[in-house]
Curated annotation (Swiss-Prot):
Gene3D superfamilies: 3.30.1370.210. It is found in: Nucleus. SMART domains: ZnF_C3H1 (SM00356). GO terms for biological process: regulation of RNA splicing. InterPro entries: Znf-CCCH_Muscleblind-like (IPR054429), Znf_CCCH (IPR000571). Binds to RNA with repeat sequences CUG and CCUG. A zinc finger (C3H1-type) spans 38-66, 72-100. It comes from Caenorhabditis briggsae. PROSITE patterns: ZF_C3H1 (PS50103). This is Muscleblind-like protein. The lineage of its organism: Eukaryota, Metazoa, Ecdysozoa, Nematoda, Chromadorea.
Length: 299
C-alpha cells in the first residue's frame, strides 16, 4: 500500500548522496516538499446547495462536514484517515475523512504521483551527471565507436524497398581504365610527333636555305611545265614534315567539372581539317585556268 512517509525515508539516502551535485537544491525540493494535490477531492455541488439525494457512501463526490475547510469547491483528504490512524476528536480534524470508494481513488492517485516523482528525480540526476562529467561522456562515446568492427556492414534486405548501390560498378571501372589508357596513349603520340618534328627541323636548318621544289612547281603554270617528272622523294619528305608540324598540338590539362569528370576527352576522335598539301597522290597539283584569249574554232 502507498505510504508517503516510507517513500520519504527511502529517498533520504539518495538525496544525501546527491548533495554534492549542482542540482542538490532542486533534488531536495522534489523529495522533501510534500505535495498534497493528490489528496484533493471535488465537493458535490448539489450537496453544497442542499439538494443531493445520495448519501456520502453512494455519491462519487465528497460530502464534507461543517468542520472541514472547503476551498474553491475542493477539500483535502486526511492522510492519517486513509491509513486508518487519525485520532483527532477534540477539536475535530479539519481534513476530510473520505468513504471507502473515494479512499481507493486517492490511493491510485498517490501511486501515480510517486511514479512521476521518481521519473523526475531520475531525469534530474542524469542531467546533473552529464553537466559534471562531459569528458567522461566523450570518452564513453569514443570507446563505443572503437568497439565497432572495421569491416563493411551490409544492411538487412527487405523486399519492396530501394537501396543505394554499395559495391562499385565493374562497367564504370573498366570504362575509366580505358579512358585513362587512351589519354596516356594520346599524350605519348603527341610527344613523339613533337620530337620527330624537332629533329626534322634541326636537320633542315644545317643545310643552306633553298626554295622548296614543291613551291616552285606550284608557282609555275600547268601548261608550261609538266609536274609528273618532279622529285617525288623531296616532295614526300616535305609533306611528312608538314603533317608532323600540323599534328603537334600543345598538351593541355583536361577540363574537369565539380564531380571530377572530364568535360572534354582528348582521346575522342577529332575530325582533321582539309589540307591540300598533305595529299600523297596529287603532289604539287594546283588547278589553274588560262587567262589567254582563245579564238573560236572556224566553222
Amino acid at each position: 500500500m502507498f505510504d508517503e512517509n516510507s517513500n520519504a525515508a527511502g529517498t533520504t539516502p539518495v538525496a544525501s548522496s546527491l548533495a554534492a551535485t549542482p542540482n542538490a537544491n532542486l533534488m531536495s525540493q522534489v523529495f522533501n516538499v510534500k505535495d498534497s494535490r493528490w489528496l484533493q477531492v471535488e465537493v458535490c455541488r448539489e450537496f453544497l446547495r442542499g439538494q443531493c439525494a445520495r448519501s456520502d457512501q453512494e455519491c462519487k463526490f465528497a460530502h464534507p462536514p461543517p468542520n472541514v475547510d472547503v476551498q474553491q469547491g475542493r477539500v483535502t483528504a486526511c492522510y492519517d484517515s486513509i491509513k486508518g490512524r487519525c485520532t483527532r476528536e477534540n477539536p475535530k480534524c479539519k481534513y476530510l475523512h473520505p468513504p471507502q470508494h473515494i479512499k481507493d481513488q486517492l490511493l491510485i492517485n498517490g501511486r501515480n504521483h510517486l511514479a512521476l516523482k521518481n521519473l523526475l528525480s531520475a531525469q534530474i540526476n542524469q542531467g546533473g551527471n552529464q553537466m559534471i562529467n562531459p569528458m567522461l561522456a566523450l570518452q564513453q562515446q569514443a570507446a563505443a565507436v572503437n568497439l565497432l568492427p572495421n569491416t563493411q556492414m551490409y544492411p538487412q534486405y527487405y523486399n519492396g524497398m530501394m537501396y543505394q548501390q554499395v559495391l562499385p560498378d565493374p562497367y564504370a571501372a573498366a570504362a575509366q581504365q580505358l579512358q585513362t589508357a587512351a589519354l596516356l596513349g594520346n599524350v605519348g603520340g603527341l610527344l613523339s610527333a613533337q620530337s620527330a618534328a624537332a629533329a626534322l627541323v634541326a636537320n633542315s636548318s644545317t643545310q643552306p636555305p633553298t626554295p622548296s621544289p614543291l613551291l616552285r612547281l606550284q608557282r609555275k603554270r600547268a601548261l608550261e611545265e609538266d609536274t609528273s617528272n618532279g622529285n617525288d622523294r623531296t616532295a614526300a619528305a616535305h609533306t611528312q614534315l608538314l603533317s608532323l608540324a600540323a599534328g603537334a598540338v600543345p598538351v593541355k590539362r583536361p577540363a574537369l567539372d565539380k564531380n571530377g569528370a572530364m568535360l572534354f576527352s582528348p582521346a575522342a576522335p577529332q575530325t582533321p581539317q582539309f589540307n591540300p598539301y598533305l595529299l600523297q597522290t596529287l603532289q604539287g597539283y594546283v588547278p589553274t585556268v588560262s587567262c589567254e584569249y582563245m579564238q573560236p574554232p572556224p566553222f
